[in-house]
């Protein structure tokens, strides 16, 4: 009895494998070779290409060393919090590796002088200032489908005004128009973004929901589609000012990884964004180095491998800026211990009430 049962199972397994082979060959005949495959047979799927954000601590918090290529990323926050700065720093890092980048400036507010200060190569940056939301998303779609773009930034979702709204009268009520536009565009874009390995960064603004009694009243513009399609969502906030004597020279910034499909989410980091310079890389090296025990702090003095960096954080930053080889050595050591730093020293913000569902996607 047991032998008959065993034979029956074996026959079924043979039938299953033959049926699977027939189904696979039929799919390949209909849709082309490579339309279906075993995941392990394609090595390119396993390796996730990344682009640095320009912030070492944020790269570590993201868990994969930067923002993922072939994915949609959303950066949102209040006004003047550093959203465009972070996107431009990502473009600058991609260009350093020879990548081709594009900037769809729906807000018509890109400052080329500031972008150059952040390290962006303006000669090789493609820029478009579209008149309507449809035009902006059509340009985005065409560039993504070309397969030649590495990083594309759309600034911002709130400025993607539907054509019907522009052609209508001031004060016309057109509910849900922008949300429908974004939903349709993302359905169309998502497959070509993956195939072309293009990173598309959407910058978004914050609005307040009226009548919310419990949880956060904040929401982002453009409906819910972007929350679902985005692989990474970053919430960026200005939490204070960086001063030299009485003069304000930068912003203290907090970034929370609200959603992350590539690694554990909810990591939270803080760094300085200096005016006319961008993310203070030397400041991050000092702060992270002390947390990880790579840079020693004794009283007000900072030292690395028995070499004094300076008295006080600002002097240590200046020393590292003047000694780039030493700064690179500390950065390399921090990146090699990225997993340990992420687990032990980066804050875990936890899900917010309004972002918990999206973050779990």
UniProtKB/Swiss-Prot annotation:
One of its GO terms (biological process) is DNA repair. Pfam families: RecA, RecA_C. Signal peptide: none annotated. One of its GO terms (cellular component) is cytosol. CDD domains: RecA. It is found in: Cytoplasm. Gene3D superfamilies: P-loop containing nucleotide triphosphate hydrolases (3.40.50.300). The keyword Cytoplasm applies. Its main location: cytoplasm. ATP binds at residues 77-84. Keywords: ATP-binding, Cytoplasm, DNA damage, DNA recombination, DNA repair, DNA-binding, Nucleotide-binding, SOS response. HAMAP family: RecA (MF_00268). Can catalyze the hydrolysis of ATP in the presence of single-stranded DNA, the ATP-dependent uptake of single-stranded DNA by duplex DNA, and the ATP-dependent hybridization of homologous single-stranded DNAs. It interacts with LexA causing its activation and leading to its autocatalytic cleavage. NCBIfam families: tigrfam_recA. Belongs to the RecA family. This is Protein RecA. It comes from Rhizobium rhizogenes (strain K84 / ATCC BAA-868) (Agrobacterium radiobacter). The gene is recA.
